Design a protein with these regions (language model features):
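Conserved small/polar residues in nucleotide/adenosyl-binding loops
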Residues: 171-178
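Mature extracellular/periplasmic domains of secretome proteins
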Residues: 125, 164-169
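Active-site nucleophile/metal-coordination loop of metallo-enzymes that catalyze phosphate/sulfate
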Residues: 21-42, 56-158
Length: 182
């Protein structure tokens, strides 16, 4: 009986949270400018944008909140990819980013390597090999799993010191290659 009395306030508190309406209303939508690409020109650049945790539901929620308009709608090409990992049902950004960066599945927590831990070539590597200028722009740390998938190689995304060292050597190597091409 005492236990029931002690749990009653917790249950009532939880019930009141469930009854509370959970909505977000954007008082004024963000203005979205329509961008029209020039006609008849060959496409010269590719920009791959990866939003962290950006599922279709997240995009749809943002689109709905902004009354059916997003800057993303200006993108000429939008794609989906299945980024599940090789050894687990649910992926992480290390394995998921590696799938995007290299086109190959890898193990959970791996960054830029195959299932045996061997380095994989990324889109950045392939473009650079064709003499294209490349770059990685981030709003997080470069050694965070998703950007690291494009320029680093490690079986453990948490091995930050090794990944930082790999990114520094990669950046130095790429700078040397760029100077050589000039």
């Amino acid at each position: 009986m005492l236990l029931a009395v002690l749990l009653l306030p917790v249950e009532l508190s939880a019930q009141s949270r469930r009854d509370k309406e959970q909505t977000y209303v954007l008082d004024q939508p963000y203005e979205v400018t329509k961008i029209t690409p020039p006609q008849g020109k060959k496409i010269k650049n590719v920009i791959l944008m990866i939003g962290d945790g950006m599922s279709l539901m997240h995009v749809y929620s943002a689109w709905t909140a902004n009354r059916g308009k997003l800057f993303l709608d200006n993108c000429q090409v939008v794609g989906l990819s299945k980024t599940y990992c090789a050894n687990k049902l649910i992926t992480d950004s290390g394995a998921g980013g590696t799938a995007i960066a290299t086109g190959q599945k890898t193990n959970y927590h791996s960054v830029g390597v195959d299932t045996e831990g061997r380095p994989l070539k990324s889109l950045v590597d392939l473009a650079a090999a064709k003499g294209k200028s490349t770059g990685i722009a981030v709003t997080c740390r470069l050694w965070d799993a998703t950007p690291a998938d494009f320029c680093c190689h490690n079986k453990d995304r948490d091995a930050e010191a090794e990944i930082v060292a790999d990114s520094v050597s990669y950046t130095h190597l790429r700078a040397h290659e760029t100077r050589r091409h000039l």
